[in-house]
């Protein structure tokens, strides 16, 4: 790969991390990321550089570590039912929002 690709990935990661500073809520970041990801999935990006840049952006913006830590705390409290419910809700809601972004993208184009 050329150095130019690495610079683009780095810039996408910086932008995503910068945006993350303004939104300090893991759930909202996850919803926004899922919506945008669903929107861009439909674009069927043909260039690998675009795919790589978007991967870098979404990896930094929607870091799943915040949810994992939240689920870890719930699990350590011993509330297994709450853990199972939250884990499933997080996955289901994000999938639905991602599909909604995909649907919006289809309606626009």
From Swiss-Prot:
A GO BP annotation: monoatomic ion transmembrane transport
Write down the membrane topology: Multi-pass membrane protein
The UniProt transmembrane annotation reads 21-41, 52-72, 84-104
Lineage of source species: Bacteria, Bacillati, Cyanobacteriota, Cyanophyceae, Synechococcales
Main localisation: membrane
The record's keywords, sorted A to Z, are: Cell inner membrane, Cell membrane, Ion channel, Ion transport, Membrane, Transmembrane, Transmembrane helix, Transport
Cross-referenced InterPro entries = FluC
The free-text function statement in the UniProt record for this protein reads: Fluoride-specific ion channel. Important for reducing fluoride concentration in the cell, thus reducing its toxicity.
Q: Which family does it belong to?
A: Belongs to the fluoride channel Fluc/FEX (TC 1.A.43) family.
Q: Where in the cell is it found?
A: Cell inner membrane
So what does this thing catalyse?
fluoride(in) = fluoride(out)
A Gene Ontology cellular component where this protein is annotated is: plasma membrane
Please tell me the species this chain comes from: Prochlorococcus marinus (strain MIT 9312)
Keyword DNA damage attributed: no
Q: Tell me what this protein is called.
A: Fluoride-specific ion channel FluC 1
Q: Name one Pfam family in it.
A: CRCB
């Amino acid at each position: 790969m050329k150095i130019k690709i690495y610079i683009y990935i780095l810039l996408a990661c910086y932008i995503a991390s910068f945006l993350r500073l303004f939104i300090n809520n893991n759930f909202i970041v996850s919803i926004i990321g899922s919506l945008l990801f669903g929107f861009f999935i439909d674009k069927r990006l043909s260039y690998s550089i675009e795919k790589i840049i978007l991967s870098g952006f979404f990896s930094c913006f929607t870091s799943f570590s915040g949810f994992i830590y939240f689920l870890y705390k719930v699990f350590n409290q011993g509330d297994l039912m709450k853990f199972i419910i939250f884990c499933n809700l997080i996955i289901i809601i994000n999938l639905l929002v991602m599909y909604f972004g995909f649907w919006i993208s289809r309606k626009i184009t």
